[in-house]
Regions:
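Conserved, mostly hydrophobic/aromatic
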Residues: 6, 18, 50, 58, ...
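N-terminal binding-site loop/beta-alpha segment at the start of enzyme catalytic domains
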Residues: 1-84
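Short, acidic/polar
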Residues: 33-50, 95-110, 160-169, 236-243
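Beta/alpha (TIM)-barrel catalytic core signal, keyed to glycine-rich beta->alpha loops juxtaposed to Asp/Glu
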Residues: 3, 40, 121-287
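Active-site mouth loops of central-metabolism enzymes
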Residues: 23-41, 87-97, 224-234
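Acidic (Asp/Glu)-rich catalytic clusters
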Residues: 8-10, 52, 74-82, 103-112, ...
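Acidic-and-aromatic substrate-binding clefts and catalytic sites of carbohydrate-active enzymes
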Residues: 61-70, 91-98, 124-126, 162, ...
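Active-site groove signature of glycoside hydrolases
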Residues: 106-129
């Protein structure tokens, strides 16, 4: 497993991270019942396999099954806390809501400190930015939790780049950006112009986390519809992950995993360096 620097946090993170959404959400990316005893056993086994294989970055959120995703991850991390980086998230309109969310996450995860607390956003609006940045807003609550030692670093997630996400970035208050970035959704990182929100984050020495690096299967399904012969000719699981890991500004790509076999498959894909590409050269030739 290769490790990369998570921006100015100076934390070394595995270039593949454990994405917790599929663990906590019912029937997300396939049949799954997160409340079952079987789910708990499988997630514990999966988390332990991930740690044994060198994965140290674990991402989850209260919104993944109303806290079930955090609870399952906490079960898997028992006795392993010192080996991992835990990243979870908050929503809420004010500092008090953030505080309540952090306290619940700490309990469910079975830890006394969260390594990275991220505001859980999507496509930001002016209203979203206001409730985060206003006095007594969500950011104030996140900073208070950090100052108290309940969390170590702050970040925010975004489905995509827009002017409002850039406003959050421009505050300089966040250490890490998590953004959707993959072979379909490339515009957060444009090597042809050296532009995009990933470049902006790197200019602040922020860590950059890619969500949905393998497009949640969308790219593969599209290929199956329009060019099935191409879909069958290439291991697109490996190819899509390799595309994202080729980004030199990326810290970690998080992939959902619910079985030890999925852990092994994701690590094998990451280790296949023959599929890595020079993104600058790629865009110079074809853009």
């Amino acid at each position: 497993m290769d490790y990369r620097r998570l921006g100015r946090t100076d934390v070394q993170v595995s270039e593949i991270g454990f994405g917790g959404a599929p663990a906590g959400l019912r029937n997300y990316l396939g049949a799954w019942e997160p409340e079952s005893d079987d789910a708990a056993e499988r997630i514990v086994q999966t988390v332990r396999r991930a740690i044994a294989r060198g994965i140290n970055y674990f991402d989850t959120a209260p919104g993944y099954g109303g806290g079930r995703g955090e609870e399952l991850l906490g079960l898997g991390l028992r006795g392993q806390r010192e080996k991992v980086i835990i990243a979870t998230k908050v929503t809420g309109d004010d500092a008090d809501a953030v505080r309540r969310s952090v306290e619940r996450s700490l309990t469910l995860l079975g830890t006394d400190t969260i390594d990275l607390l991220q505001y859980h956003g999507g496509w930001y609006s002016a209203e979203d930015v206001d409730k985060i940045l206003r006095p007594g807003g969500a950011l104030a609550g996140m900073q208070a939790a950090r100052d108290e030692g309940l969390v170590r670093h702050l970040g925010f997630t975004a489905e995509g780049p827009n002017g409002f996400a850039s406003q959050l970035l421009a505050t300089g208050a966040f250490d890490v950006l998590q953004i959707c970035h993959n072979v379909i959704f490339q515009h957060p990182y444009d090597p042809s112009r050296h532009a995009g929100i990933i470049y902006d984050a790197a200019a602040q020495d922020m860590g950059v986390v890619a969500m949905r690096p393998m497009t949640s299967g969308t790219f593969q399904r599209w290929l199956g519809m329009v060019a099935p012969q191409v879909q069958e000719a290439v291991d697109w699981h490996r190819a899509t992950l390799a595309f994202v890991l080729s980004n030199p500004l990326l810290s970690v790509a998080i992939a959902g995993m619910r079985t030890p076999e999925e852990v092994d498959a994701n690590i094998a894909a990451a280790e296949d360096r023959l599929m890595r590409v020079d993104l600058d050269l790629l865009h110079t030739r074809y853009v």
